[in-house]
Every structure is written in structure tokens, then in C-alpha cells.
Design a protein with these regions (language model features):
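Enriched for short, Lys/Arg-rich terminal
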Residues: 1-8, 12, 16-23, 27-29, ...
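A short, surface-exposed loop/turn module that caps and links secondary-structure elements
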Residues: 30-54
């Protein structure tokens, strides 16, 4: 089982969204703890996010990377589709 860690930016978004969205994100994070590689709607990213993956939850995106040796899933960014890929 993997451990979830949030970046500041991801934690900030997580704290300010509504309860329904938090529930959807929590459901996905529980699945990521079990298996960060085998979820549907997951895609390996390119360009500036190389080495990271993206999971889609409706119009929300979670960008994360996995450290297999330490069993950590690091949540880099959580946000709406239009905002998550901006710097």
C-alpha cells in the first residue's frame, strides 16, 4: 500500500473545494493508495510533467508521481482542467 503526500498547491485546492468534490477526490485517492498504476482514466504525461501521471475525475485533474522504492504517491497538482496545466 502506498502513502499519499500533497504538494502545497494540491493541498490548497483540496481545502477549498466543495464536499461533493472532496468525496470524489478521496475515493480516487483511496484507489491510488492501493494501485497507482492500474486505474482507468490515467495517462502518462509528457513535456514539463514528464515522469508524472494524470488521472481524470470529471473536469478535475490530479497530476501525481510515484516513488516505488519508498511507496509514496506524491500529488503534485489538483485542479480544474483549464488551470492544472498552467504554470
Amino acid at each position: 500500500m502506498y502513502r499519499i503526500e500533497f504538494s502545497r498547491k494540491a493541498a490548497k485546492f483540496y481545502k477549498r473545494v466543495d464536499a461533493v468534490t472532496v468525496g470524489r477526490i478521496n475515493n480516487t485517492l483511496e484507489k491510488l493508495e492501493e494501485n497507482p498504476f492500474g486505474l482507468p482514466n490515467t495517462k502518462h504525461l509528457k513535456a514539463e510533467f514528464i515522469g508524472s501521471c494524470r488521472i481524470r475525475i470529471g473536469n478535475i485533474r490530479i497530476i501525481y508521481s510515484v516513488n516505488d522504492s519508498e511507496k509514496i504517491v506524491y500529488i503534485e497538482v489538483i485542479g480544474f482542467r483549464g488551470d492544472v496545466y498552467k504554470k
